[in-house]
């Protein structure tokens, strides 16, 4: 494999036995693709905004005289870019302008004659835009719209599994779910009658729906039943025989024909009997009269002479009926064929309980159910029923719904529309009856073929359509009012409802979430999250076990591991690594096609619906060099996801990769295959909580997924085009683009500005650090600068720490950890947290608040860190209570007593009419001010500090643009110089001229002269473009800010807090092995090995066996080997051994094992080998892919190569006594994370503070400055000790005895330390509550 310049800096050795067939796809596709479909920059096809507009327009007035037509739409450019929107606290959005056409028809002339057309662009609000990283900036904060997993539209057949009725009878039901519109349910009741419900309302007999569709009783029976025919001949009753129908019944009489008895009375009719009847071609048999009694007629029988109905359809036949039929001249009677086995009489029974008799009565019944209390009219009843299922405005199955519907009812694809037809409804009822009759299966609702993904674009489109429908109502009313002379489309449209709907969705929908920005992984997983909650989804309380469970169809689509613990378990899932959604919104996963036992390179994506029909082999099946299966029988997933053994020629597909089944976070856990699933779940979830450390450190033991995640997360800076590094410093990188990647006429320069020390949503620090040097070549898509938690373009969430598994004086009891002081000294887990504090100056009734350094009654020392505008300096170190922004608020005039007036008159005006309302640092916080931003309302004069900030921003912007111009000019003048030299101008002449003068030279060659003139024009263009860009920047910087009503000024102060690791902080490995630091131990007391190297963290070995996460042990061993090889390389470099030896050793390390990866160092130059070796000194980075990782033999081989014992255990000595520990101890390197659960954020103390209103007990929680709850069990503990007075104090004066605590306070002030407990307030509350129950309670004096 060929490596690029930057890849050669550090190569991760992979243990993967199988070569990668398919690269990891771009991880944010689900978000970006969905939103692109929504806004379609070049609308084609009916989706997104285009579909929404087309579904609502044209809007026609009620009289048809005018209509408002939609022509096209365009999205403008956003005013501010993403970064500016975040700073200003605005939404990153683009204006939507729609071209509408108002057409007026001439009423007098022929139909369709146009009288007037007005076309106009109408503003329809702002549409939030997605950033390149799949997020939205709403009011300055980054948000993510999580995709939703909801039940697909279509028809579903289900049963209650015998839970509804006491008898345990299974009741079947069918439900037609449209994308939008009314739900239609059919269900059996315990008596086997079929009922229908519309929108889950009161149930009606299902035949009412059929009658409302216009069917008569006879037609209904005809559709659902086969008939049996009886003939009356010479007083004999003959039945037309269909032998197959008799199977399984017991003969009630002798079945005979032509004198031969085929079945004796009382015998069960079997297939043998039927064959005999068919062989002899028996078509009729004689039956006793009783056999027809109780049967049901299939049609109306009318007395032809009188026109009177002798026997209506669906009536039971009795002896009288037979006589009446014979009298009316009928000798052939058709009855319904039913039996108790597999042809139930359900529809016939339902018709008997149906109170309606024709279409109108059925429509009225439906109207009464839907609109109780309203008087039904024929028109209203018809309109209601039609609008419910047969109107495209109110009902839409959608393409997905129609596809699922047709699949379920075996209708050919492409048949049918978005609304229901009569055949659709009848088809559903027929299939439901078939299932009740024992033919056919119910659907599995949790199958991923029945649940689909709704992503951002689709949800935004639905919200937009809701807004449009509101507008449509208003427009239609306005059009119907008439008098449209001089009215333009702009006058008709009010964009507020649209803006409101869109704003509500992006701002406060349950699926629009504050982005989890702890680290790059948490960003990526948040964008790939799939939630079953949200509008139109499930609710936590109602979701049962089945919905939450892992389903066979999750394989390769949703991760079976990564899901939250707690009430949302199983409802919130994560997309698997290779999963994607298809056009219908169903999840697909890729497979390699297998033809005749030969695995091909062809890759096909299958959805859960399609996958069920195939036999699929696992990714780790053994193949030979020709990609044929080597085993006689291969373990595969067969039909319905069941596992089994199959021969190679029976296999259709093979998995693409071993990590196909898990999500991105789970794919980061090395040796995942050796961890218990519950712990792996914790490991995957805790990686998302890791705080970026000061210096990122790549994991020695990784899985190979680190690079794709870091690149796709968008936190690092990636080269858009290849080139060489022309300039690099901490805040910007300039790349000179390769000639072949530039566009003609451009200078070929890319400038990347880096993000420095900004705050993330979780208050962690976002900072980018260049990882390239001047003059280095870079390729397109390669890393230029590392972001938070990335190291040379690889995800680095924690630190490689030397750990030992052993008890140490009880300091690692119950998952605690003992940490060496060295870890603190080296700042291994030091993190920076940035807090934003803001001060708002408002316009109050009594006058404007003012930001100033002149604050009443505050000493000089308190103002020492403020400038003349009253705002803190950048770089000031502040602690709790310090003033950051001085602010005074006017207070109401107070009446002064004469003495005060006199003092005022003598000593001058003391600022009495204002009170201090400055912004102070919250208690318990200290840090350094790293940035201040001042926002001033338009029309309010800016203070000096605001002007200074503006100056700096202008200078920065100008510097950026000037630099860009200089680089562009340099490129241009190089071409001019070459042209002039070719044209015969002497080198010396050029050296003596200023560069601008070169363009004024004249050349003899006309073609060259033309080229020179073109270059001169280009130079002029560059200058103009520079001026234009500078002007735009300048206007943006100096314009006033759009602040909330009544706000004059906002000052935001950013504090950076440096947090070292300390006891009480939570740490974890990647295998769910979490714990809290119990003690920071001096280095000299830590256990050390024979070389005197102390361990850094001591972990408890008892945390491993019961938790069954053995992966951490294997990681520790492999980490030790990786570090051992690094140490050997380090030794060789220090001894300055020749490069050949170094190259040989490193090659040996890369060649070890049976991995598919091959690294050939012979293609590397000496300089490249040296650079690689320098980067490997801290350890050889290894990748052990999920389910395809390193074997025990490979780990031992690496340990040997590193000169370490193959057991992975070494002798340790006690740091305090120097004595040897009696057993060997497992020591190695584990990748540890510091989680965002820091003791600083949790620790809190209170002496006195606020109390709850009713109970008068102290509030709870740090945010409320609450107290510690002394609960039931703590009371028992004090009771057990017999500590009566302590208990009394706890329950009275320290809690809710109001008088007692005020007295106590007074006593302490007076210096007399005794308490007088009284009655606790909560006792009074319970007394009042008992009195509220009308029980009087009086207190006696004790």
Curated annotation (Swiss-Prot):
MF annotations from Gene Ontology: DNA binding; DNA-directed RNA polymerase activity; ribonucleoside binding
Protein known as: DNA-directed RNA polymerase subunit beta
Reactions mediated catalytically: RNA(n) + a ribonucleoside 5'-triphosphate = RNA(n+1) + diphosphate
Disulfide pattern: none
Organism of provenance: Glaesserella parasuis serovar 5 (strain SH0165)
Similarity remark: Belongs to the RNA polymerase beta chain family.
Gene giving rise to this polypeptide: rpoB
InterPro entries reported in the protein's UniProt record: DNA-dir_RNA_pol_bsu_ext_1_sf (IPR042107), DNA-dir_RNA_pol_bsu_external_1 (IPR019462), DNA-dir_RNA_pol_su2 (IPR015712), DNA-dir_RNAP_su2_dom (IPR007120), DNA-dir_RNAP_su2_hyb_sf (IPR037033), RNA_pol_bsu_bac (IPR010243), RNA_pol_bsu_CS (IPR007121), RNA_pol_bsu_protrusion (IPR007644)
Keyword annotations of the record: DNA-directed RNA polymerase, Nucleotidyltransferase, Transcription, Transferase
Superkingdom classification of source: Bacteria
Membrane spanning stretches: none
EC numbers on record: 2.7.7.6
GO BP term, example: DNA-templated transcription
One term under GO cellular component: DNA-directed RNA polymerase complex
Physiological role: DNA-dependent RNA polymerase catalyzes the transcription of DNA into RNA using the four ribonucleoside triphosphates as substrates.
Keyword Transferase: yes
Subunit structure: The RNAP catalytic core consists of 2 alpha, 1 beta, 1 beta' and 1 omega subunit. When a sigma factor is associated with the core the holoenzyme is formed, which can initiate transcription.
């Amino acid at each position: 494999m060929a490596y690029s310049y930057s890849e050669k800096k550090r190569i991760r050795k992979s243990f993967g036995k199988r070569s990668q067939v398919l690269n990891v796809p771009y991880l944010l596709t689900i978000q970006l693709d969905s939103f692109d479909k929504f806004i379609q920059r070049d609308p084609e096809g009916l989706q997104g905004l285009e579909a929404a507009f087309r579904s609502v327009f044209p809007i026609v007035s009620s009289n048809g005289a005018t209509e408002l037509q939609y022509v096209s739409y365009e999205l403008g450019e956003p005013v501010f870019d993403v970064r500016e929107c975040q700073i200003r606290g605005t939404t990153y959005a683009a204006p939507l302008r729609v071209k509408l056409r108002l057409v007026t028809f001439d009423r007098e002339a022929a139909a369709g004659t146009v009288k007037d057309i007005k076309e106009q662009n109408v503003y329809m609000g702002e549409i939030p835009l997605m950033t390149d990283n799949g997020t939205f900036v709403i009011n300055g904060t980054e948000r993510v719209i999580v995709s939703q997993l909801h039940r697909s539209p279509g028809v579903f057949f289900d049963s209650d599994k015998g839970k509804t009725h006491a008898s345990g009878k299974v009741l079947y039901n069918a439900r037609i779910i449209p994308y939008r519109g009314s739900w239609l349910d059919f269900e059996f009741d315990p008596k086997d009658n079929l009922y229908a419900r519309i929108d889950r309302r009161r149930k009606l007999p299902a035949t009412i729906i059929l009658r409302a569709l216009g069917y008569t009783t006879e037609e209904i029976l005809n559709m659902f039943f086969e008939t049996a025919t009886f003939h009356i001949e010479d007083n004999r009753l003959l039945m037309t025989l269909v032998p197959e129908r008799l199977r399984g019944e017991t003969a009630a009489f002798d079945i005979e024909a032509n004198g031969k008895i085929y079945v004796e009375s009382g015998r069960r009719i079997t297939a043998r009997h039927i064959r005999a009847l068919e062989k002899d071609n028996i078509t009729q048999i004689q039956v006793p009269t009783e056999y027809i009694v109780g049967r049901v007629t299939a049609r109306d029988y009318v007395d032809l002479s009188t026109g009177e109905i002798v026997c209506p359809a669906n009536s039971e036949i009795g002896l009288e009926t037979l006589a009446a039929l014979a009298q009316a001249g009928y000798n052939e009677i058709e009855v319904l064929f039913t039996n108790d086995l597999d042809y139930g009489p359900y529809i016939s029974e339902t018709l008997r309980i149906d109170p309606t008799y024709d279409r109108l009565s059925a429509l009225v019944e439906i109207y009464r159910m839907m609109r109780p209390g309203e008087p039904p009219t024929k028109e209203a009843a018809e309109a209601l029923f039609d609008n419910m299922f047969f109107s495209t405005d109110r009902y839409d199955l959608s393409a997905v719904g129609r596809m699922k519907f047709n699949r379920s009812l075996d209708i050919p694809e492409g048949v049918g529309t978005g609304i229901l037809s009569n055949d659709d409804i009848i088809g559903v009822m027929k299939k439901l009856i078939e299932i009740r009759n024992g033919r056919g299966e119910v659907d599995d609702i949790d199958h991923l073929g029945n649940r689909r993904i709704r992503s951002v674009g689709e949800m935004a489109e639905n919200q937009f359509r809701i807004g449009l429908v509101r507008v449509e109502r208003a427009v239609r009313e306005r059009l119907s009012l008439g008098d449209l002379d001089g009215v333009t489309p702009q006058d008709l449209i009010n964009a507020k409802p649209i803006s409101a709907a869109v704003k509500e969705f992006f701002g406060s929908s349950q699926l629009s979430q504050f982005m989890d920005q702890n680290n790059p992984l948490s960003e990526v997983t948040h964008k790939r999250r799939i939630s079953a909650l949200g509008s139109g989804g499930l609710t936590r309380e109602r979701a049962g076990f089945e919905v939450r469970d892992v389903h066979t169809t999750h394989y390769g689509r949703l991760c079976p591991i990564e899901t939250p613990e707690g009430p949302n378990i199983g409802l919130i899932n994560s997309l698997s690594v290779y999963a994607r959604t298809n056009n219908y919104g169903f999840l697909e996963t890729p497979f390699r096609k297998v033809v005749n036992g030969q695995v091909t390179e062809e890759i096909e994506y299958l959805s859960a619906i399609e996958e069920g029909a195939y036999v699929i082999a696992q990714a780790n099946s053994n193949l030979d060099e020709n990609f044929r299966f080597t085993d006689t029988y291969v373990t595969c997933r067969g039909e319905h996801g069941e596992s089994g053994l199959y021969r190679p020629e029976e296999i259709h597909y093979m998995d693409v990769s071993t990590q196909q089944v898990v999500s991105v976070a789970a794919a980061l856990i090395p040796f995942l295959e050796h961890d218990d699933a519950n712990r792996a779940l914790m490991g995957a979830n805790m990686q998302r909580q890791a705080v970026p450390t000061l210096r990122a450190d790549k994991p020695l033991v990784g899985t190979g997924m680190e690079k794709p995640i870091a690149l796709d997360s968008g936190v690092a800076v990636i080269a858009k085009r290849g080139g060489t590094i022309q300039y690099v410093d901490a805040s910007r990188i300039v790349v000179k683009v390769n000639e072949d990647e530039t566009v003609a006429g451009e200078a070929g320069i890319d400038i990347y500005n880096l993000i420095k020390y900004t705050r993330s949503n979780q208050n962690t620090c976002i900072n980018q650090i260049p990882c390239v040097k001047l003059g280095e070549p870079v390729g397109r898509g390669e890393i230029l600068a590392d972001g938070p938690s990335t190291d040379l373009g690889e995800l680095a969430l924690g630190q490689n720490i030397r750990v030992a598994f052993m008890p140490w004086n009880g300091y690692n009891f119950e998952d605690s950890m003992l940490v060496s002081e060295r870890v603190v000294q080296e700042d291994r887990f030091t993190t920076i947290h940035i807090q934003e504090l803001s001060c708002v100056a408002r316009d109050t009734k009594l006058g404007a608040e003012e930001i100033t350094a002149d604050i009443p009654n505050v000493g000089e020392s308190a103002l020492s860190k403020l400038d003349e505008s009253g705002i803190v300096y950048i770089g000031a170190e502040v602690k709790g209570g310090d003033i950051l922004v001085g602010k005074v608020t006017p207070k109401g005039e107070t009446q002064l007593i004469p003495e005060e007036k006199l003092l005022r008159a003598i000593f001058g005006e003391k600022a009495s009419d204002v009170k201090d309302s400055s912004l102070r640092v919250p208690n318990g916080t200290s840090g350094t001010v790293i940035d201040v931003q001042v926002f001033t309302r338009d029309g309010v004069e800016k203070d000096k500090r605001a002007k200074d900030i503006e100056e700096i921003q202008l200078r920065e912007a100008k510097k950026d643009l000037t630099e860009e111009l200089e680089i562009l000019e340099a490129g241009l003048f190089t071409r001019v110089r070459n042209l002039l030299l070719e044209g015969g101008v002497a080198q010396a002449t050029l050296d003596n001229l200023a560069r601008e003068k070169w363009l004024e030279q004249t050349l003899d060659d006309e073609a060259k002269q033309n080229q020179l003139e073109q270059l001169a024009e280009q130079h002029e263009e560059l200058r103009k473009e520079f001026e234009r860009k500078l002007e735009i920047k300048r206007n943006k910087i100096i314009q006033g800010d759009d602040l909330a009503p009544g706000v004059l000024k906002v000052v935001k102060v950013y504090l950076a807090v440096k947090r070292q690791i300390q006891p009480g902080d939570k740490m974890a490995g990647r295998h769910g092995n979490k714990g809290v630091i119990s003690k920071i131990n001096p280095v000299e007391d830590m256990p050390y090995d024979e070389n005197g190297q102390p361990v850094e963290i001591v972990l408890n070995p008892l945390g491993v066996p019961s938790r069954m996460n053995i992966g951490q042990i294997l990681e520790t061993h492999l980490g030790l080997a990786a570090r051992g090889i690094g140490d050997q390389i380090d030794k060789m470099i220090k001894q300055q051994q020749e490069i050949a030896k170094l190259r040989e050793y490193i090659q040996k390390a890369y060649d070890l094992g049976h991995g598919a990866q091959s690294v050939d160092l012979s293609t590397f130059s000496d300089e490249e080998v040296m650079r690689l070796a320098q980067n490997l000194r801290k350890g050889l980075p290894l990748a052990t892919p999920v389910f395809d990782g390193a074997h025990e033999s490979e780990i031992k081989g690496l340990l040997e190569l590193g000169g370490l014992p193959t057991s992975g255990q070494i002798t340790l000595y006690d740091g305090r006594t120097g004595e040897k520990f009696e057993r060997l101890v497992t020591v190695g390197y584990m990748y540890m994370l510091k989680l965002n659960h820091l003791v600083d954020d949790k620790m809190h103390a209170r002496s006195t503070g606020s109390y709850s209103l009713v109970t008068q007990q102290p509030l709870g929680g740090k945010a409320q400055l609450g107290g510690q709850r002394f609960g039931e069990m703590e009371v028992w503990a004090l009771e057990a000790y017999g500590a009566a007075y302590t208990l009394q104090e706890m329950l009275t004066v320290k809690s809710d005895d109001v008088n007692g605590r005020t007295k106590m306070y007074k006593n302490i002030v007076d210096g007399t330390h005794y308490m007088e407990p009284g009655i606790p307030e909560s006792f009074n509350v319970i007394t009042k509550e008992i009195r509220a129950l009308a029980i009087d309670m009086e207190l006696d004096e004790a």
